[in-house]
């Protein structure tokens, strides 16, 4: 089976409601000053810090190309705007401030999350800097945000540490879910089936081209928890074929060596999510009642002023954010994702257990025996 190519104009699962946020046609640069700080870049999108000329407030300007590979993808951008509007009252989803449009792109003016990606907290160098209590708080907030989306029949479909931001890193702030370019609306009569995403974060049902449900996001939350607690990526292989095989067979290392500093409750939480059958994964709502999340100790949170290595967490995350590039918001419907995924140029900050690829070949082409 070859990889399906989707026309942006016929993608299923898009919100078709007209955005309530006015799409301004005035020159963006008349109202905002773009700083040299680039927050992320992909093939079809770039995110840069900007400052309001009227208030001095910092924002993130996400510029999205309207045409991608010769296809008109404006409808997908409007879908992303509609999802952000739908989640406006959720504190754990990035806030949309304004929208501008010119001949070639649409610019989303978004809340600025100064703490960067929680991917930085997954780096081995920070293993001693982030406690399990910190992870509990972050996972709980992610679940609250995802539960809100699922209540509104929205699946994110690209949850990963690179798409979860922090309001601050020093001290550790609150999470903000970003990048809804792959998100879809579910619950209507037609089933949603697409092959899209980042290889090491794909759920088994996506590899099998089975219907997508809210359980797909729950698989990704299991991966995020695993990475925050072990500082390794659970399914990444030497190449895409090995990665897909690991996912299909749910080859996860739960060894004592890997989980030596992880509680049994945390292990149970991860194991409940990383199961092949989507119907056996708990919902976001039920996860919030898991025993692991109920034993959060407010008294032992990350306090940088009390941590001897606190400057290291700031230095490492600053280095990481400056050196790496991030993703675009284009999904499978606009062609393969060819964006770089947070790779420091010298590779110094990335564990050998993390690997990011420029494209997403068909799982069926790479591992045909798994998909009979």
From Swiss-Prot:
Q: Which UniProt keywords apply?
A: Apoptosis, ATP-binding, Cell membrane, Kinase, Membrane, Nucleotide-binding, Nucleus, Phosphoprotein, Serine/threonine-protein kinase, Transferase
What Gene Ontology terms describe what this protein does at the molecular function level? ATP binding; protein kinase activity; protein serine kinase activity; protein serine/threonine kinase activity
* EC class: transferase
Q: What is its EC number?
A: 2.7.11.1
- Give me the Gene Ontology terms describing cellular component: actin cytoskeleton; endoplasmic reticulum-Golgi intermediate compartment; Flemming body; nucleoplasm; nucleus; plasma membrane
Name-wise, this protein is Serine/threonine-protein kinase 17B
UniProt function note? Acts as a positive regulator of apoptosis. Phosphorylates myosin light chains.
Post-translation changes: Autophosphorylated.
Q: Spell out the reaction equation it catalyses.
A: L-seryl-[protein] + ATP = O-phospho-L-seryl-[protein] + ADP + H(+); L-threonyl-[protein] + ATP = O-phospho-L-threonyl-[protein] + ADP + H(+)
Q: Which family does it belong to?
A: Belongs to the protein kinase superfamily. CAMK Ser/Thr protein kinase family. DAP kinase subfamily.
Gene this protein is translated from = Stk17b
